[in-house]
Amino acid sequence: MNVQAGFVELVVRNLDKIEEVKESFPVTGGIDIIVKVEGPDVETIAKTILAKIHSIEGVSRTETHIVVPL
């Protein structure tokens, strides 16, 4: 996820309030925060990202990757 300059700490604090967010890590490089979201199905995860995470002040972009079992 990318956030606006100066918003990393605020975004992480707000992510911690979301039940489906299991972990969040500020990182360096091309993205600002890596977020682990869990849910019973893809629809729940999508709703969490679109309705809850995208509404956090400072969030400018998300990119979703889904883990698939081998």
Pin down the residues of each PLM region.
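A compositional/biophysical signature of low hydrophobicity enriched in polar/charged and small residues
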Residues: 1-70
